[in-house]
């Protein structure tokens, strides 16, 4: 029986820092960081030895140090495989950018750019000038501006047009968006007084007409993109609402939420109102998002009457809500893709993923199932190809689903599947699926890099236990 381990045999921090295997780590991570992590490793070794553990050699200490440094340098905001079946997943960053947008953003990051500089006159320029012409071309609006998201767009539009006055909204359109942000709360922050009309399921033209008075600044129409009321319902069409507003000298603000620049039905998806249609119907201002159906970076767009856009741009909030050169560059590159609608689905990742037919996704699942099954079988998991349903996400077309396909993984118990899902989340590139009906389902609609997926999966398959 061996006696107690002599901790004096444990190398000191200085000895380890001078070791040949540690010197490159100091060069890579910095002496202060390596020293800090090395002290933690040696502290853990002392505790383990005092509890009866063996004293590791220098190689073991270096391995533990490497592991800690890797964990420390790894970003939590790292790429992952979104196999949840929700294409525009709010918690996973929504839209993936087109390569043209990525390239434009990188160029803007690397060099100085004429963000607010007029190269013709040599004087101060406008930040919006890089997007105004594109937005007006694609929507038919007189003018346009951009802020950092659609909630900000609604906030500043309401504040600019209606602060201290009333805004009329149908009760059926008082929505709540993600994170418990409610339209009445946004209106309160904007400084407008909410006037509710109609009922939850039915609002008529006469309800708006009756509510308009001397203190009315605007009518707010909100596209209920994240839910749908069906059955005994009625709402006032945008064109009719515009006529009511204009006859009585008030502004019509139409918040489209997700917002689409093209008719999605041509790509086999459900019908969503387009921004151009809202402008043509007579809305004075239209707000919509950049990182949802449009497929660009996060942004909130406001298009409409030139005088109202000018008023918004004079609002002190505009500076607080403005976007930087990186997002402007990526947004401009994204918008330019819409000039060629025939090739849009092949160039815009969001639209490409949404428009993939089920047969194509199923063929991908059939290619991958044998390999994934072989990796997980030793741990007691079975893999089969399955049909499933994808959804758009981010509040767009909430009741519409898209026929899809994927891999259905079953184990010995529900706890085994939860353990497998946790293992997948811990991989160098996490794999996210969804647990349902006694299985872990990986919807492959959003999987583009099969080789990287298999490589990542192989890293953790040996640790899976059913």
From Swiss-Prot:
Superkingdom assignment: Bacteria
Location, primary (coarse class): cytoplasm
Localization annotation: Cytoplasm
Cofactor(s) of this protein: pyridoxal 5'-phosphate
GO molecular function: L-seryl-tRNA(Sec) selenium transferase activity
Modified sites of kind N6-(pyridoxal phosphate)lysine: 292
Xref: Gene3D superfamilies: 3.90.1150.180, Type I PLP-dependent aspartate aminotransferase-like (Major domain)
Pfam assignment, any one: SelA
Keywords: Cytoplasm, Plasmid, Protein biosynthesis, Pyridoxal phosphate, Selenium, Transferase
NCBIfam families: selA (TIGR00474)
Protein name: L-seryl-tRNA(Sec) selenium transferase
Recorded name of the encoding gene: selA
């Amino acid at each position: 029986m061996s006696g107690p381990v002599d901790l004096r045999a444990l190398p000191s921090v200085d000895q380890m820092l001078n070791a040949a295997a540690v010197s490159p780590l100091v060069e890579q991570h910095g002496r202060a960081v390596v020293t800090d992590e090395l002290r933690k490793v040696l502290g853990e070794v002392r505790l383990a030895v005092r509890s009866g553990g063996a004293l590791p050699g220098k190689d073991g200490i270096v391995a533990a140090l490497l592991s800690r440094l890797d964990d420390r340098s790894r970003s939590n905001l790292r790429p992952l495989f979104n196999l949840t079946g929700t294409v525009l997943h709010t918690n996973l960053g929504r839209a993936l950018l087109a390569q043209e947008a990525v390239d434009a953003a990188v160029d803007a990051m690397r060099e100085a750019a004429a963000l607010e500089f007029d190269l013709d006159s040599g004087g101060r320029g406008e930040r919006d000038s890089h997007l105004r012409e594109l937005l007006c071309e694609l929507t038919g609006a007189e003018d346009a501006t951009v802020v950092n998201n659609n909630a900000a767009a609604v906030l500043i539009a309401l504040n600019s047009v209606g602060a201290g006055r009333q805004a009329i909204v149908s009760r059926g359109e008082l929505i709540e968006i993600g994170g418990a942000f409610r339209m009445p709360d946004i209106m309160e922050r904007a400084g407008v007084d909410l006037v509710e009309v109609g009922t939850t399921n039915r609002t008529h033209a006469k309800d708006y007409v009756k509510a308009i008075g001397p203190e009315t600044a605007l009518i707010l129409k909100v596209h209920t993109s994240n839910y749908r009321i069906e059955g005994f319902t009625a709402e006032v069409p945008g064109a009719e609402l515009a006529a009511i507003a204009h006859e009585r000298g008030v502004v019509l603000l139409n918040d489209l939420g997700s917002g689409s620049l093209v008719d999605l039905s041509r790509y086999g998806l459900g019908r969503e109102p387009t921004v151009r249609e809202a402008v043509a119907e007579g809305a004075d201002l239209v707000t919509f998002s950049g990182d949802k159906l449009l497929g660009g970076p996060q942004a909130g767009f406001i298009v409409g009457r030139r005088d109202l856009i000018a008023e918004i741009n004079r609002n002190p909030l505009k500076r607080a809500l403005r976007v930087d050169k990186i997002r402007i560059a990526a947004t401009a590159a994204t918008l330019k893709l819409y000039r060629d609608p025939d090739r849009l689905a092949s160039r815009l990742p969001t639209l490409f993923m949404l428009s993939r037919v089920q047969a194509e996704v199923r063929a991908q699942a059939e290619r991958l199932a044998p390999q994934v099954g072989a990796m997980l079988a030793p741990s007691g998991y079975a893999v089969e190809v399955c049909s499933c349903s994808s959804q758009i996400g981010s509040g767009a077309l909430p009741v519409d689903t898209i026929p899809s396909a994927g891999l259905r993984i079953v184990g010995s118990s529900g706890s085994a599947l939860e353990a497998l899902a946790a293992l997948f989340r811990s991989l160098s590139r996490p794999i996210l699926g969804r647990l349902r009906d006694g299985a872990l389902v990986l919807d492959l609609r959003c999987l583009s890099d099969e080789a990287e997926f298999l490589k990542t999966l192989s890293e953790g398959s040996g640790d899976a236990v059913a």
